[in-house]
Amino acid sequence: MKRHRPVSSSDSSDESPSTSFTSGSMYRIKSKIPNEHKKPAEVFRKDLISAMKLPDSHHINPDSYYLFADTWKEEWEKGVQVPASPDTVPQPSLRIIAEKVKDVLFIRPRKYIHCSSPDTTEPGYINIMELAASVCRYDLDDMDIFWLQELNEDLAEMGCGPVDENLMEKTVEVLERHCHENMNHAIETEEGLGIEYDEDVICDVCRSPDSEEGNDMVFCDKCNVCVHQACYGILKVPEGSWLCRSCVLGIYPQCVLCPKKGGALKTTKTGTKWAHVSCALWIPEVSIACPERMEPITKISHIPPSRWALVCNLCKLKTGACIQCSIKSCITAFHVTCAFEHGLEMKTILDEGDEVKFKSYCLKHSQNRQKLGEAEYPHHRAKEQSQAKSEKTSLRAQKLRELEEEFYSLVRVEDVAAELGMPTLAVDFIYNYWKLKRKSNFNKPLFPPKEDEENGLVQPKEESIHTRMRMFMHLRQDLERVRNLCYMISRREKLKLSHNKIQEQIFGLQVQLLNQEIDAGLPLTNALENSLFYPPPRITLKLKMPKSTPEDHRNSSTETDQQPHSPDSSSSVHSIRNMQVPQESLEMRTKSYPRYPLESKNNRLLASLSHSRSEAKESSPAWRTPSSECYHGQSLGKPLVLQAALHGQSSIGNGKSQPNSKFAKSNGLEGSWSGNVTQKDSSSEMFCDQEPVFSPHLVSQGSFRKSTVEHFSRSFKETTNRWVKNTEDLQCYVKPTKNMSPKEQFWGRQVLRRSAGRAPYQENDGYCPDLELSDSEAESDGNKEKVRVRKDSSDRENPPHDSRRDCHGKSKTHPLSHSSMQR
């Protein structure tokens, strides 16, 4: 059908926006469908294309239009298909629909899922073995890094590329691996050559060093085992290398008949078990199926249980089957290979009937036969063999040492460079550095071989019941040790706690005692250093005192007139104890104390205790209260050396002792009372008696001091009891005596009278000639009269003191007597 061009009102239809419906009518006519009166949805418009066209004469900027150069320009004349009524085009409506969860209708059971290849790994997982193999086994140290920096500078000057750290680590690893592999091969080759050309090499089966034509000795090129052709069943020696059965399969099995590995082994019928050919020959129950090929080994099951139960006398292992000594009376068992290693006598005897008999002897019978052989042959063949063996060993060790020193000759730089794909120059630098570093490390490898690392790993083993029982037994023993340690630690801590508590109690009692003495205004008799450190032992010193002035002689004569000169004059003390001493004499005695001559002082030491007790009981209160001058002069002005010297004087006297004195015993009533009084209240007695401070105090110390060893061996308990007793006595000392019963006061006076009538206890600690008595009997009688006159004058001049001092003097007497009576 011919297409007609529609009539246009303009000259150029391209410029008029007319619309042609001819094509639509044409399509409607052509379609011949029932809906021919229906309006079309699309129409073709040409005006859009005509509006885009420009005439060729129209001048336009070349940048503002496009030039069509294709050949399908005429197709644009047909028009563009557009919707007939754009307003009636339906608008799409959208809504979001929730995703529907798919119901799982079938779940594949996991028990039916199996991995076909155990080596394959799932995607996303890492194979640890592959990762470990890919990691380099050598790490650079600081020296390597510094050297690598210098190498890169030299390579940059040469115009070569640098070498990074990872590449150097891989190069060193390859060098070590090549060196290790080539050294192992060289050692095997050297060992094989040594065995092959050694005249003393023997067959591993028959133990014979001889060979003959057609029965040559063959060596395995891998394990270097030496066998005869007939012994191992080699029908024809192959050209080139030869490997034994186990080396062909690449395994290293263990013999079922002995605990040894390696050697000339053959398999059984099943092919799963291996046994030495020598073991199969020497054990009578075992046989070989094909003697020509010497395989397979059969009748292992015919070995009786009694043979399996035998224990080897050489290796002490109950493994495999043992043979016994051929001597009928000997039952010693041993493995065949153990007998070969220890050099036992193993004989192969060919019988008349072409039967082979095997004779084996234990260590004892082999030595007897060797001794008989040495008697027949005087040549020391054994010594020569040992020397040859030692020479062979030393030669082999020397070869190995030379091989280790020349390790660098086993590595080729070209092979390493080809394997790593590196330039030969860089590899050669690293090779020389590796050689120097290994030389500085005594030719030792820079890291251990891989085989050693794998062997060093702990392989899991099947735990048997015996192993578990042994483990539990060791665990129980360890727990028992822990329990004992815990008990010992707890006991130690308890002892430390009790020790600390005792020390705390001692410290508290000491502080309490010191506080009470300070409150009472008394001197600190028991100071801290006296309780913690015991007094030193008594020492007798030889002193030379300077000559005194006339005033000192006058003062000393005044003092000596008031005291007895010897123990014989003790009766005069009792006769004048009721007399009063003038106050002037008291002051004069106190002031002139530091300048006493030692000769006159020694005369008064023996009678000072009795005189002080009598004066403390019956004298006036003026005798019981010391003055401040006496306190400061008597207790604080004595050096330690002088006290020690006078302490030794107290037991000398006139060089005589009283054998009838009851104070020689320290465990009686009176003796213990005197010791307790003089020891505990020595400071108070010095003030009450108005005597020199060292007289009664040191006499009491001389009667109750023990040796140094006894003082230092006192326990904490004894020390605590001593402080407790001192505190109790001090409390009795401070308390007033109003509450004391007349009976207790009476007993105290009786004990005081008894102790005053006796001389103090004397100990012969030593003799000092410079401190001897110097006054005579006549002088002492004259001094007695002067003492009586001064006492009468003091009674008339000095009034009695207050009752408080009197009570204070009584409190020093009665508590002491009361405590002594209780003891």
UniProtKB/Swiss-Prot annotation:
A zinc finger (C2HC pre-PHD-type) spans 252-286. SUPFAM superfamilies: FYVE/PHD zinc finger. It comes from Homo sapiens. The gene is JADE3. Ubiquitously expressed, with highest levels in placenta and uterus. It comes from the Eukaryota. A zinc finger (PHD-type) spans 200-250, 310-366. GO terms for molecular function: zinc ion binding. Residues 8-25, 561-575 have a biased composition (Low complexity). GO terms for cellular component: histone acetyltransferase complex; nucleoplasm. Keywords: Acetylation, Metal-binding, Phosphoprotein, Repeat, Zinc, Zinc-finger. Gene3D superfamilies: Zinc/RING finger domain, C3HC4 (zinc finger). Residues 781-809 have a biased composition (Basic and acidic residues). GO terms for biological process: regulation of cell cycle; regulation of cell growth; regulation of DNA biosynthetic process; regulation of DNA replication; regulation of DNA-templated transcription; regulation of transcription by RNA polymerase II. InterPro entries: Enhancer_polycomb-like_N, EPHD, Histone_Mod_Regulator, JADE3_PHD, Zinc_finger_PHD-type_CS, Znf_FYVE_PHD, Znf_PHD, Znf_PHD-finger. CDD domains: ePHD_JADE3, PHD_JADE3. This is Protein Jade-3. The modification Phosphoserine is found at residues 85, 566, 608, 774, 776, 780. Component of the HBO1 complex composed at least of ING4 or ING5, KAT7/HBO1, MEAF6, and one of JADE1, JADE2 and JADE3. Belongs to the JADE family. The modification N6-acetyllysine is found at residues 30, 32, 601, 638, 735. Induction: By estradiol in estrogen-responsive breast cancer cells. Residues 1-32, 372-395, 542-576, 609-630, 650-684, 758-823 are annotated as: Disordered.
